[in-house]
Amino acid sequence: MDFGSFLLYALGVLASLALYFVRWNFGYWKRRGIPHEEPHLVMGNVKGLRSKYHIGEIIADYYRKFKGSDPLPGIFLGHKPAAVVLDKELRKRVLIKDFSNFANRGLYYNEKDDPLTGHLVMVEGEKWRSLRTKLSPTFTAGKMKYMYNTVLEVGQRLLEVMYEKLEVSSELDMRDILARFNTDVIGSVAFGIECNSLRNPHDRFLAMGRKSIEVPRHNALIMAFIDSFPELSRKLGMRVLPEDVHQFFMSSIKETVDYREKNNIRRNDFLDLVLDLKNNPESISKLGGLTFNELAAQVFVFFLGGFETSSSTMGFALYELAQNQQLQDRLREEVNEVFDQFKEDNISYDALMNIPYLDQVLNETLRKYPVGVGSALTRQTLNDYVVPHNPKYVLPKGTLVFIPVLGIHYDPELYPNPEEFDPERFSPEMVKQRDSVDWLGFGDGPRNCIGMRFGKMQSRLGLALVIRHFRFTVCSRTDIPMQINPESLAWTPKNNLYLNVQAIRKKIK
């Protein structure tokens, strides 16, 4: 046998072995007697992920197909087996009752080579517990009240800019405007920096924030490899954040930290808290103080959480209200009733937190558009888990499980006519009739959204201010139906959000 023939033979053997391994791996759930859909040779059950479909849509489709017939179907993320939790009682166990066995999210991060991914949302085990305990004090109601004045000041600038833009055109891109509002809020609260992106069309914080969420570093195939083989990917030094995003935020945070430490500046904001953790070696139990990279990661995720989730939530709310003037008028009436008690819209924090219909509108928005949780929650088993009362279902240690938030939120048994935008679903009477795990706008259990209070404050104020001063209707450039960006980590619009805007109050001088 000559060398060429031997090489072809060897390649054939390797290809056969690879195909055998792939087929054996795809028999993972069948060998356990757990139903699943037939997987694609390369992409498993997530064919079209990030190119055509958002992960939330794929998991929601599983919910619709298997609900009522199976409590825990299997799914393949590329070649990685995972499961989708459909049963409500099992959902409670995963998120709350048996949380100790599902404390990790199972998401890829690489602290060594991609340090900004080592943040509270991603990290696991004792490190997560310690960070959660130490970071929680910055999100108390008292801290929110301290940060509130900053949000209020930026809110006034938001109104000024919108009035100015209306002198040029009545059709405004509210997605862009609200993203700039939130960038300026978070820039001040997290970095102590006046971004002024509302007036600066080329603000770098805004551009890098968008890129970190909407522009993946790798294509879908490479991301499927990372998801399937996370430990190998870490050993290979694989990163997920774009390089320019990494460099921008690391340098921005370092400059701010150096300036504060050199000049002994304190603002009692989020950055001050993580600086205290960095400089106090006893502050995090078994782990010691925060390193600079760990500090930077927490500031980075705080920026992303406040920037994208709040702006998209407000944008989606305006999109729905623009199509339903009756709901918009009712919200405006309740907002005005409270705001009229304060001079020049300087509403207090406590008053803002007590506008019930505003809360209902935002909760219904997060039902239809679960921005913060990315339309699906993930958890990972820390040990083998036998499903109570159903021993057929055993999740081996390390199994990733999905909570299909989008599927739950659009379940007609829970929310009749789920495509309809109806804030009455969140009246006190209706909320009492549902279980907490039937609405997961901020997650549930010990690993819910730590920044929930801040996100609510930011979204409530921004939405209340613009509804008080402007009327919103759809225009020829409004994207109906709304299209979602399949590449985005969060549940965000694919296109701009143009609405017709009409001023209905005099400009505050």
Curated annotation (Swiss-Prot):
Coiled coil: none
Keyword line: Endoplasmic reticulum, Heme, Iron, Membrane, Metal-binding, Microsome, Monooxygenase, Oxidoreductase
GO molecular function: heme binding; iron ion binding; oxidoreductase activity, acting on paired donors, with incorporation or reduction of molecular oxygen, reduced flavin or flavoprotein as one donor, and incorporation of one atom of oxygen
InterPro entries xrefs: Cyt_P450 (IPR001128), Cyt_P450_CS (IPR017972), Cyt_P450_E_grp-I (IPR002401), Cyt_P450_sf (IPR036396), Insect_CytP450_Detox (IPR050476)
The keyword Iron belongs to this UniProt entry's keyword annotation: yes
Stated name of the protein: Cytochrome P450 6A1
Binding site for heme: 449
Topology within the bilayer: Peripheral membrane protein
